[in-house]
A protein has these predicted regions:
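Repeated scaffold domains used in trafficking and secretory/extracellular systems
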Residues: 2-8, 40-47, 83-91, 131-141, ...
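Structural motif
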Residues: 20-22, 61-65, 108-114, 157-167
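Short loop/turn segments that connect beta-strands within beta-propeller blades
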Residues: 27-29, 68-70, 118-120, 171-173
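Sequence/structural signature of beta-propeller modules
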Residues: 2-5, 191-250
Length: 250
C-alpha cells in the first residue's frame, strides 16, 4: 500500500485511510473496496464500536458519515461556518447511539462539544457553548473506567491568554473531577493524542509537534515507535494529574 495517509485506522473487518482529499476503505487483506471523494481537508476519522458506520471530519467544518455494508455515503453536512482549525477529535458512545465532536463555532480559540444521535446524525445539544475562555482539544472514552475524559485549556479573563490546563471526566454531559496539568504536560499529551487518533501514521508524525518542538524540548526527541509504546490515554493522564490548579500567573 504505497499511499501516504494522514490517518489510517481500522476494526476487525475494515481499514480506513485518509489522504486529505480521498477516503479509502480496504478489507483486512489490503484490497481497496472504495475511494470516496466527497470532502477536502479530511484528516480525522472514527469508526463506530458497532462496526456499521464511520465518520470523517474536515478542518474546514464539514462532516461525512459512511456505512460499511453497503459501502456508501449516508450524510454530509457543514457543522460550522468556521473554516479552518477544526482538527480536534471525536468519539462514539460505547453503545454507538451517540457521537461527540469537539467543534469551533464562533472562534478557533473557543470550542464546544456537540452531541449527535447516530440514527440520523441530528444534533442533540451543544455542550459548554456558554463558557467563555474555554477550549477542549481532545475527548476519549476509556473502557477500563467506563468514562469519557476531555483535555482542555482555560483562558485568563484579564489577558485572554491560556493560564490553566486541565483533564476532566465527562459524566452525564457535565465536566466533573477536573484535574490540572502544566502547560508542557497538556501540550505533550495533546501532541501524542493527535497521533493516536490518526493511527500513528508516518505522515502525521512528520507534520506533528514532534517535528519542531524537539529542537528545544527533550520530551519530543522520541521516535514514532517510542510514542506508540507510551500506551497514552487521557484516563492515565487524569490519574496522574494534580488535584489543585497549576495556574500560570498573568
Amino acid at each position: 500500500m504505497a499511499k501516504k495517509f494522514w490517518t489510517f485506522i481500522g476494526n476487525d473487518k475494515y481499514d480506513i485511510g485518509l489522504t486529505g482529499s480521498t477516503v479509502y476503505v480496504y478489507d483486512k487483506n489490503g484490497t481497496e473496496l472504495a475511494a470516496f471523494k466527497d470532502l477536502t481537508y479530511a484528516y480525522n476519522a472514527v469508526i463506530s464500536p458497532l462496526g456499521d458506520i464511520f465518520v470523517v471530519k474536515t478542518t474546514d467544518g464539514r462532516m461525512a458519515i459512511y456505512s460499511f455494508e453497503p459501502l456508501k455515503l449516508i450524510k454530509k453536512f457543514r457543522f460550522s461556518k468556521i473554516d479552518g482549525g477544526q482538527d480536534e477529535n471525536m468519539v462514539f458512545s460505547p453503545d454507538g447511539k451517540y457521537f461527540y465532536s469537539i467543534e469551533s463555532h464562533t472562534s478557533t480559540l473557543k470550542t464546544l462539544l456537540a452531541k449527535y444521535k447516530t440514527d440520523d446524525f441530528s444534533l442533540v445539544c451543544q455542550l459548554f457553548s456558554d463558557r467563555e475562555r474555554f477550549r477542549l482539544s481532545a475527548i476519549e472514552y476509556d473502557e477500563n473506567t467506563d468514562c469519557y475524559y476531555v483535555l482542555g485549556i482555560l483562558y485568563s479573563p484579564v489577558t485572554k491568554m491560556a493560564n490553566t490546563w486541565f483533564v476532566a471526566k465527562l459524566v452525564d454531559d457535565e465536566l466533573v473531577d477536573m484535574r490540572y496539568l502544566t502547560e508542557g504536560e497538556r501540550d505533550f499529551g495533546d501532541a501524542v493524542n493527535r497521533l493516536k487518533v490518526m493511527g500513528y501514521t508516518e505522515k502525521a508524525f512528520q507534520w506533528s509537534a514532534f517535528r519542531y518542538k524537539k529542537e528545544y524540548d527533550d520530551r519530543y526527541k522520541i521516535s514514532l515507535d517510542e510514542i506508540k509504546a507510551l500506551n497514552y490515554s487521557l484516563a492515565a493522564l487524569w490519574k496522574n494529574a494534580s488535584t489543585t490548579p497549576i495556574e500560570k500567573k498573568d
